[in-house]
């Protein structure tokens, strides 16, 4: 990686956690990812969720149809785990190169997760098959019991679900997605080579004070929810250390403005347009730009056993203002950092 004062040239990055939705929303948001990233792990939480090879093939085609000419982008599809999923269907999709990984959502943990897994025991035959064939498990790591405080759900998940699962299936490759706590950062750092994590730009840049002090900022509301400052700092220190089992996963999750700015607003930040520059800003603030390329472009492929991309992109350090909104057919989409001035952006 070369890093003169104003330009960062890095190998083309990948996004290892992305929501593209469907229909008109998909057509609107895909280009913001496909112009920057070589590949993206696409989340399967549509309504209904992607649980079959045929559904994944059809969804992949809808994504590819939305990629503008001249963009070189490969969507990597995932299977949504349910209590009733057939292990043979999962293995067939993996062997045919349709499914790159499978996603475990605890039931009702986040958007469109009502079909999710009620308990790990319920899907043990599926997980055992995944361990056998070397298929990565992607985990939304929160418990959903009503009596557990929302700020404690990730830490509780580690002790009650994640660690028992990894003790039981020691060869299973696991990605602890969008980690938000010091507990998770420590757990992944202290784990073995079969455990990795993704981190979003919002969890590196902000903590719960930013979302709640001086007024509620619904466009910072996502799940897992922003935590207190000590957790934000632990995440920043993890990425700044150059640790090689943490990588870029934006969790970009678009919702129309009226669904965010609501008396019961949806969780998710649409950060695809600004994520890469946001990550660069964090690495610069931490004096860790030497580790930026690995986080964006190397660590993920290494964990998944895929080649790194062979093209390069440049980020430029010059102030730019983020658009206030992006037009949808019958509403608008508010991007992460809307209306704000950002330090780094992708060179056009």
From Swiss-Prot:
PROSITE patterns: DIHYDROOROTASE_1 (PS00482), DIHYDROOROTASE_2 (PS00483). Keywords: Hydrolase, Metal-binding, Pyrimidine biosynthesis, Zinc. SUPFAM superfamilies: Metallo-dependent hydrolases. One of its GO terms (cellular component) is cytosol. The modification N6-carboxylysine is found at residue 103. It catalyses: (S)-dihydroorotate + H2O = N-carbamoyl-L-aspartate + H(+). It is an enzyme of class 3 (hydrolase). The keyword Repeat does not apply. Its cofactor is Zn(2+). Disulfide bonds: none annotated. Zn(2+) 2 binds at residues 103, 140, 178. Substrate binds at residues 19-21, 45, 140, 223, 255, 267. GO terms for biological process: 'de novo' pyrimidine nucleobase biosynthetic process; 'de novo' UMP biosynthetic process. Catalyzes the reversible cyclization of carbamoyl aspartate to dihydroorotate. Homodimer. This is Dihydroorotase. It comes from Escherichia coli O6:H1 (strain CFT073 / ATCC 700928 / UPEC). The gene is pyrC.
